[in-house]
């Protein structure tokens, strides 16, 4: 009887986790992923890779840790940021005049799992963890949902040791309630091929790390966005202990950042080139040394909503409502002069997510972001 009850309890628990919680907001609205496909539970890492890469609709449920670590490789690593304790090395064959060494690392971290179209990947509670390998969305894949999982331990000591989530020629993808931590290079990287209709929501970008380029436990590599005409909704995310590229609008990206919390950033948050477009509203910047990098921001199109509402009504002509006010707490740099919104005319036809005032979300986002469902 006891065994039967335990089995019944497990079945009930899994049933509640087999369907997506909520729906995608913003640019990925309408995404269905694996739809109503019968949920499958991969037994091991090999089956997980096989299911994610297979054709057709799939709902894949993670109930444990899938550990890809332990596949050793050796290579040359450069001491590009010093030899002190906590300094990252960079994996590359030629270090030039920079001191170098031979290192052993996990080979799996450098090769992410390719995810095929029409997939839903769900975690049960806090149990769904992928350790030592990331996910990639390339070659025109579309209609994918990833929700309530954790991706962690991708060679954190080494730049080029692995990226958590890679997008390069993809569309209609929602990444929701995902925690990324201890990542060798970038948490979210968007390659040069277009990525349209992407929503990153309620995620925890945990930059607290054992190794970093600044040798101080703050990760520099947050979000690198180099795609052509990418459209990304970034809502409800918590970014903790980063020091740069959070995000880097390095391509011609349309980036809507709404109701996010940046906390304890000892470098800079926003950077980008002359083609990037960033609409930032209803956000909280708390203890951010430099909100926008004057060194790395190359006069692209950027709007930062004000704290007191001044100028936020300028958004109404383009998105049908005023932009939500933001909160700036003990922050540095110039974050008051990014007031032009005329470039939002380029966003005609895009689905713009609703956005609350920052004061309404500042206490909830840090505790709800990540694999907390």
Curated annotation (Swiss-Prot):
Disulfide bonds join 78-95, 87-215, 315-323. Residues 1-17 form the signal peptide. It is an enzyme of class 4 (lyase). GO terms for biological process: cell wall organization; pectin catabolic process. GO terms for cellular component: extracellular region. Glycans are attached at residues 140, 229. Its EC number is 4.2.2.10. GO terms for molecular function: pectate lyase activity; pectin lyase activity. It catalyses: Eliminative cleavage of (1->4)-alpha-D-galacturonan methyl ester to give oligosaccharides with 4-deoxy-6-O-methyl-alpha-D-galact-4-enuronosyl groups at their non-reducing ends. The active site is at 245. InterPro entries: Pec_lyase, Pectin_lyas_fold, Pectin_lyase_fold/virulence, PEL. Keywords: Carbohydrate metabolism, Cell wall biogenesis/degradation, Disulfide bond, Glycoprotein, Lyase, Polysaccharide degradation, Secreted, Signal. SUPFAM superfamilies: Pectin lyase-like. It is found in: Secreted. Gene3D superfamilies: Single-stranded right-handed beta-helix, Pectin lyase-like. Belongs to the polysaccharide lyase 1 family. Pectinolytic enzymes consist of four classes of enzymes: pectin lyase, polygalacturonase, pectin methylesterase and rhamnogalacturonase. Among pectinolytic enzymes, pectin lyase is the most important in depolymerization of pectin, since it cleaves internal glycosidic bonds of highly methylated pectins. This is Probable pectin lyase C. The lineage of its organism: Eukaryota, Fungi, Dikarya, Ascomycota, Pezizomycotina. The gene is pelC.
């Amino acid at each position: 009887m006891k065994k039967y009850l335990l089995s019944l309890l497990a079945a009930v628990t899994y049933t509640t986790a087999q369907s997506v919680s909520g729906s995608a907001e913003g640019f990925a609205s309408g995404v269905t992923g694996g739809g109503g496909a019968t949920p499958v539970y991969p037994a091991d890492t090999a089956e997980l890779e096989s299911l994610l890469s297979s054709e057709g609709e799939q709902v894949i449920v993670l109930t444990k840790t899938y550990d890809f670590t332990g596949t050793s490789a050796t290579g040359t690593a450069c001491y590009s940021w010093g030899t002190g304790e906590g300094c990252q090395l960079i994996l590359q064959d030629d270090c030039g005049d920079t001191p170098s060494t031979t290192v052993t690392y996990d080979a799996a971290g450098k090769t992410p799992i390719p995810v095929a179209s029409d997939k839903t990947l769900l975690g049960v509670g806090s149990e769904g963890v992928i350790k030592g390998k990331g996910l990639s969305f390339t070659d025109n894949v579309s209609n994918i949902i990833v929700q309530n999982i954790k991706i962690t331990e991708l060679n954190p000591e080494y730049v080029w040791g692995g990226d958590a989530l890679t997008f390069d020629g993809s569309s209609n993808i929602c990444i929701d309630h995902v925690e990324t931590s201890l990542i060798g290079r970038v948490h979210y990287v968007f390659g040069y091929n277009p990525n349209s209709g992407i929503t990153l929501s309620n995620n925890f970008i945990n930059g607290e790390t054992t190794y970093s380029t600044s040798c101080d436990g703050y990760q520099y590599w947050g979000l690198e966005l180099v795609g052509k005409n990418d459209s990304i909704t970034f809502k409800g995310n918590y970014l903790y202990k980063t020091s740069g590229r959070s995000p880097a609008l390095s391509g011609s990206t349309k980036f809507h950042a709404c109701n996010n919390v940046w906390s304890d950033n000892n470098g800079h948050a926003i950077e980008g080139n002359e083609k990037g477009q960033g609409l930032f509203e209803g956000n909280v910047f708390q203890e951010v040394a430099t909100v926008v990098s004057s060194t790395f921001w190359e006069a692209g199109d950027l709007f930062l909503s004000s704290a007191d509402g001044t100028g936020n009504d300028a958004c109404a002509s383009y998105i049908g409502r005023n932009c939500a006010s933001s909160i700036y707490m003990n922050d540095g740099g110039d974050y008051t002069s990014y007031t032009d919104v005329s470039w939002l005319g380029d966003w005609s036809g895009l689905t713009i997510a609703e956005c609350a005032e920052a004061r309404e979300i500042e206490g909830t986002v840090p505790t709800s972001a990540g694999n907390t469902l």
